[in-house]
Regions:
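Bacterial N-terminal signal peptides that target proteins for export
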Residues: 34-46
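Serine residues within intrinsically disordered or low-complexity segments
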Residues: 16-18, 27, 54
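Low-complexity, intrinsically disordered or signal/transmembrane-proximal segments
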Residues: 7-9, 13-14, 25, 30
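Bacterial N-terminal signal peptides
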Residues: 45-56
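Aromatic (phenylalanine/tyrosine) cluster motif
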Residues: 4, 9, 55-58
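Low-complexity, acidic/polar, glycine-enriched regions of mature
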Residues: 59-229
Length: 229
């Protein structure tokens, strides 16, 4: 407590009244006051940094590249009017997603290799690639382009157009789950989505089995991950 002991200041010693007053002010700068000032400045700087980082994280649209190793469009289709369900997936897809969380907008562009269809049955795979279904030789790719729709802060659907078999039709996908996080191995942000849609394959000129009682309703299920660029 020595810093707070009364002190006597000699005007003559300090040359003038103003010099004496400066000496008094200097003596009043206790280390505790300096520490408080330092903490206040650090808190202000930290707040400014946090605000700038928060703003930059949501400023403008970010671009994400689909991770082909973790992106699988899959489908469910009827066999003989309810006898069983055919299930399969496409092993090769690529595309780009843009996402602006601040503006609540986004886009999706995906291209799928139709020859990469995989059901677990070589015979069925060959049939699906043939002219009876996808005609993958003539129409090697399917594409989907759409706009992401938000409900509040959350992406809830994609409204766009699907092109298969050379035919383009509207298709809405409902997003069941969506999450973005720092990937522990890639050390980059990754977003994942699970979405579902439904279409009539007859609308795309793929009506094999209709005369046998097949339902042409096809369920499309999307599991995808995309890496921020």
């Amino acid at each position: 407590m020595d810093a707070f002991k009364p002190q006597i200041y000699d005007v003559g010693q300090h040359g003038s009244v103003s010099g004496c007053w400066r000496a008094i002010q200097t003596s009043m700068k206790h280390p505790m006051n300096e520490e408080i000032d330092l903490k206040r400045h650090l808190m202000i700087a930290a707040g400014a940094l946090a605000a700038s980082l928060s703003f930059s994280a949501f400023a403008g649209a970010a671009t994400y590249q689909l991770d082909s190793d973790h992106t699988y469009p899959s489908f469910e289709a009827d066999h003989l009017g309810g006898l069983s369900i055919w299930r399969g997936k496409f092993d090769k897809s690529q595309g780009t997603v843009t996402l602006d969380l601040a503006a609540k907008t986004g886009t999706v562009e995906v291209t799928t290799d139709m020859a990469s269809v995989h059901t677990g049955s070589t015979k069925l795979d060959q049939m699906l690639q043939s002219g009876q279904f996808f005609d993958a030789t003539k129409f090697p790719e399917a594409t989907y382009r759409g706009a992401i729709k938000f409900n509040g802060e959350k992406p809830v659907s994609v409204v766009g157009n699907l092109t298969i078999h050379g035919v383009t039709r509207p298709l809405k996908l409902t997003i069941n789950s969506f999450k973005c996080m720092p990937h522990p191995m890639l050390k980059r942000e990754v977003c994942g989505v699970d979405a579902v849609g439904e279409f009539d394959r007859g609308d795309f000129g793929i009506d094999y089995g209709k005369s046998y009682g097949f339902s042409l309703k096809t369920k499309l299920l999307i599991s995808a991950e995309a890496i921020k660029q």
